[in-house]
Amino acid sequence: MKKGLMLIVLVAGLCGITKAQAQVEEVIIEQRLPGYKTSFEANPFWHNWFVSANFGANAFFAEHSSQAKFKNTITFMPELAVGKMFNPWWGLRLQGGGGALHGFTDNAGSMLHMHYMHMNIDFMMGLINFFAKYNPDRKFDIVPFFGVGGMTRKHQQSFTIHGGIQAKYKISERFDANIEFQGMIFNDKMVETGGFPNDGLGGLTAGVTYYFKGRGFRTAPK
């Protein structure tokens, strides 16, 4: 009788150990999943919103730009944006900016100083958070973005295609520092018509991003 009872207790103990090991292995496997295979809890609408301000320089590429000195094509570039992250690796933002463009006549004989404004909506994808194991304490990410928008100058308007890449570093729960390279293509009629079917603008900026209260995500239980 005692031997039978001991055997039952031993079998139950072994089953418990095996189950615990399986749970540990399952947790380890789950922790090793990349971000795109990880499920996250839905966050409230007002969580993970951010605003950012960047400042730098851009260069205008159009007819006769290659005939001018590169330094003469460069102008100041301010950019402001507001957006929301929907999970750790993707989000949307609305970005706007403006300033001056330096175009040129034939043989760069004279410079055209033109003011413009633009606005675009971008899809943003964090590559490291997408491919690497999800880590809420991760400091660094590389974020390509692509979007569409519009541009205006005096009485001219144009549809724009916008894209680039951002490197960001998490300073604190509320602040990120970032460096961003971006480019924009728009209609040739915006400046000096002729030559290229489209004109372009390329810029390099640096700035900060502020996250409102409620930043972060929780993995969804299985």
Task: Give the location of each predicted region.
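Residue-level detector of the transmembrane beta-barrel scaffold of outer-membrane proteins
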Residues: 50-52, 91-93, 141-145, 176-178, ...
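Short loop/turn motifs that connect adjacent beta-strands in outer-membrane beta-barrel proteins
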Residues: 38-48, 89, 128-141, 171-174, ...
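Predominantly the C-terminal beta-signal and adjacent terminal strand-loop region
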Residues: 101, 105-109, 170-222
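Residues that define the transmembrane beta-barrel architecture of outer-membrane proteins
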Residues: 47, 70-78, 115-119, 138-140, ...
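Residues on the lipid-exposed face of transmembrane beta-strands in outer-membrane beta-barrel proteins
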Residues: 53-57, 80-84, 121-127, 146-150, ...
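Gram-negative (and chloroplast) outer-membrane scaffold detector with strong preference
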Residues: 88-161
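Cleavable N-terminal export/targeting peptides
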Residues: 1-44, 214-222
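Short glycine/proline- and aromatic-enriched beta-strand/turn motifs that initiate or cap beta-hairpins
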Residues: 20-83
